[in-house]
Amino acid sequence: MSLAVCIILSGDYHYALSKSPDRHPTNEEVYREIGYETIDKALQEFAAHFNQGIELPLRTPPISFTHTLGRFNDLDGEDKDSLEIKYINEKLPDNHYKITVRPVEHRFPFKEEEVIKVIKLQDGEEAVYLDRDGFNVLSFERGYWQYTLSINKRASDLMLPGVLVQIANSIEFATEES
């Protein structure tokens, strides 16, 4: 009993709880452990690394999310560096949406057999709608960046590619406002 009081008084109560073998880590702890942080912080790190400004879409899919997270992946060589923005719902695991951004010069390739269709965006550029690993994906280029919007197929069964296109087009609006 006195050990518990010492832990509480020393301010290490939260730490002691988090290291308990009977306690499961929270989503926040798990994501923090693998490098996720606030979207703003990840955006700043990514933009500073490439010395380029970046805009994110203003829109999100019309499904509910409980968490928004960001991670700048600074890996070996700039060709592997990317920004990941995740939107998840801890109560509905199928509600998983991700934005990945990388420089156009290091664009992520895709296979022709993955392409469902090519769609023209509002700015006249083409986007590729893909079926990849259980996700519906829209990949397009805007300025210096390649954007890849991915949404879990189980969450997007009722959504047409038009939803991802609306999200992609909302970057143009954000750019005009800057």
Residue ranges and their predicted role:
Residues M1-S18:
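Sec-dependent N-terminal signal peptides of Gram-positive bacterial secreted proteins and lipoproteins
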Residues P21-V137, R142-G143:
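Short, solvent-exposed recognition patches
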Residues A4, A16, A42, A47-A48, ...:
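A sequence-composition feature that detects small, non-aromatic residues
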Residues T148-S178:
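Surface-exposed amphipathic alpha-helical segments
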Residues D12, E125-E126, L164:
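Generic hydrophobic/packing signal
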